[in-house]
Amino acid sequence: MSTVDDILEHIGEFHLFQKQTFFLLALLSGAFTPIYVGIVFLGFTPDHHCWSPGAAKLSQRCGWSQAEELNYTVPGLGPSDEASFLSQCMRYEVDWNQSTLDCVDPLSSLAADRNQLPLGPCEHGWVYNTPGSSIVTEFNLVCAHSWMLDLFQSVVNVGFFIGAMMIGYLADRFGRKFCLLVTILINAISGALMAISPNYAWMLVFRFLQGLVSKAGWLIGYILITEFVGLGYRRMVGICYQIAFTVGLLILAGVAYVIPNWRWLQFAVTLPNFCFLLYFWCIPESPRWLISQNKIVKAMKIIKHIAKKNGKSVPVSLQNLTPDEDAGKKLNPSFLDLVRTPQIRKHTLILMYNWFTSSVLYQGLIMHMGLAGDNIYLDFFYSALVEFPAAFIIILTIDRVGRRYPWAVSNMVAGAACLASVFIPDDLQWLKITIACLGRMGITMAYEMVCLVNAELYPTYIRNLGVLVCSSMCDIGGIITPFLVYRLTDIWMEFPLVVFAVVGLVAGALVLLLPETKGKALPETIEDAENMQRPRKKKEKRIYLQVKQADRPLS
């Protein structure tokens, strides 16, 4: 009997059909970036200070410039963190309507030292030094309410986590295409509703709904294109699918620069999702999934459609996809399948840890470097460019030395770079930046590798579930990373880097325990996945008897 990989060798492993499908799914990948990192622009926090009606009237009467108004009426102006808090969150508790106040240094008539004047929290709102708007400026998510911005980002990661578990199961149970279209529809509607949210609470609800479906949709797209192409092109489309995400980062920076209003920006980045609903007529169901569910007739119909699109025909000798008579009923994925057998259990635990590590180091290094500066658009753009060399290195090495060693080395390089940064003195700033970029490049490679290899280690009927469950650990990492960075820096500025170093080095060592997937067909059954490990001893070359008869391969 034939496998899908056998048939693709004859009808085209990456011909017209696969190229068109990849292009459509790459658009989906790029459109995910505003949800994953859009907080940089949607939640931008500009310089701000308390607004006082009395001080504003006095400024107008005296004809002060903006600099003079800030100097005369805002406490604690200075470079220190304490001074920044005072200037942004506190005000002088004085009556600005007093007739004794002069236009030149008005507070001098009340106290010889203005530091002796009583201070209080802002009562009438804030003045924001920005021409645009963000959720911070509209809902005043600053000072005592700054935690609400953290919650805004945390809730989308909670959505990522729940959605990965829920939709991953549904995609393996009811099909990739159905779940992909459902996630696109919900993402489009919730994104549009978020743009017109009347208050913070409703905005939070729609943000959660976006998180619930958006990441799962991105990963389903990854699984789909991986299952449509032949063995020789899996790694290429996997890497290019993630490069499309990086291209989305660059486009997002440009769109955010052109549209500085957060509501219109949210509309702009949501609109493509409505266009993606047309994929109902453009992208078929995965024939690999159909075969795993014993829907052989439908699978062969799609395979013939692919062959026709590629200008090929399916050889008669390869059209026998009928399972054995005793193959039993179609397989239903279960969470227990991810840990039931020894090798798959090992794969699951190592992959979960590496997803967690990639998220913590990727986001943590960005936070620790403090990339956001005077121009967030350029900073964001330049930081995205770092990801292209990482993808280029993977393309150069992955077919020459395999997946496992580049993946392990990239984790170790990231960890070693973090450790080296601890011992570099501050006066060698150029060296610290260079090492930091090296670490960012290493963890970017690791992030791309874990996504690529994850899909190659699971059998077809639990592949989508395995990818989404394991990748949910990066959502846990995304939730705790801000606390990890900011709490540990209170103890010692370099403390987070020490933690990152240990986590990264351990991740690299664990990768070496995984089997090499270079040049191997995607496992179709649990038996295939259990026997992926390189043979060592004769007694280890066995098929696990606990695998059910229904799990036999079709060929």
Curated annotation (Swiss-Prot):
Q: Which domain of life is it from?
A: Eukaryota
Catalyzed reactions per annotation: (R)-noradrenaline(out) = (R)-noradrenaline(in); (R)-adrenaline(out) = (R)-adrenaline(in); serotonin(out) = serotonin(in); dopamine(out) = dopamine(in)
Q: What is this protein called?
A: Solute carrier family 22 member 2
| Gene3D superfamilies the UniProt entry points to | MFS general substrate transporter like domains
Q: Which UniProt keywords apply?
A: Cell membrane, Glycoprotein, Ion transport, Membrane, Transmembrane, Transmembrane helix, Transport
Q: Topological domains (Extracellular): residue ranges?
A: 43-150, 199-210, 260-263, 370-375, 426-432, 486-494
- Spell out the NCBIfam families in the cross-references: 2A0119
Location comes to:
Basolateral cell membrane; Basal cell membrane; Apical cell membrane
Which topology term describes how it sits in the membrane? Multi-pass membrane protein
Report the PTM annotation: Tyrosine phosphorylated.
Q: Which family does it belong to?
A: Belongs to the major facilitator (TC 2.A.1) superfamily. Organic cation transporter (TC 2.A.1.19) family.
A GO biological process of this protein is: amino acid import across plasma membrane
Glycosylated positions are N71
Record field: transmembrane: 22-42, 151-171, 178-198, 211-231, 239-259, 264-284, 349-369, 376-396, 405-425, 433-453, 465-485, 495-515
What is the activity regulation entry?
A: Tyrosine phosphorylation of the transporter leads to activation of the transport activity. Inhibited by cGMP, most likely through a cGMP-binding protein that interacts with OCT2.
